[in-house]
Amino acid sequence: MKALFRSLAVLVATASFAFAGTEGWVTNWEEAKAKAKAENKPILINLTGSDWCGWCIKLHKEVFSQKAFTEYAAANLVLMEADYPRKTELSPELKKQNAALKKDYLNEGYPTVLLLDAEGKKLSEEIGYREGGPEAYVKHIQELLAKTAKK
């Protein structure tokens, strides 16, 4: 029984960290804005429930962790994750920051993916999971950015 409990604890801990520290993603809002300014890139912010939201988990697994997306994002976006987990405790600072981001940007539900300029001005908003995989997701982002560039 103890071995089963230990195995389950390891599995939960591993799953909890599957999203945290994902390569290329920052979790600090000020860092994301500074990086966006320095690199002259828009911010893609993912408001997610990484350990409880099925659509968020699917989006991460099928899009955000795939090579087609990560390569495009590395060259063209600043990636930020604002997580609202139920099983993982965030630091008080991160909780406070994410609560403010939720108040400012979350209107309907998870996942919410926003494209923002370096000042935090909303360029576009996507609520829920978008079918089609990483290539289609990248194409959609490119189209959204092209539309905002024309404005």
Region locations from a protein language model:
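Hydrophobic beta-strand anchors of alpha/beta hydrolase catalytic cores
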Residues: 44-45, 53, 79, 113
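Short pre-active-site segment immediately N-terminal to redox-active cysteine/selenocysteine motifs
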Residues: 40, 48-52, 109
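Non-catalytic, surface beta->alpha helical segment in thiol-disulfide oxidoreductase systems
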Residues: 62, 104, 108-149
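Thiol-based oxidoreductase modules, predominantly thioredoxin-like and allied folds used
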Residues: 23-26, 66-96
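Sec-dependent signal peptide recognition
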Residues: 2-10
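Boundary at the C-terminal end of the N-terminal hydrophobic targeting segment
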Residues: 18-20
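A short beta-strand-turn-helix
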Residues: 26-43, 73
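Conserved redox-active cysteine motifs that mediate thiol-disulfide chemistry
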Residues: 48-64
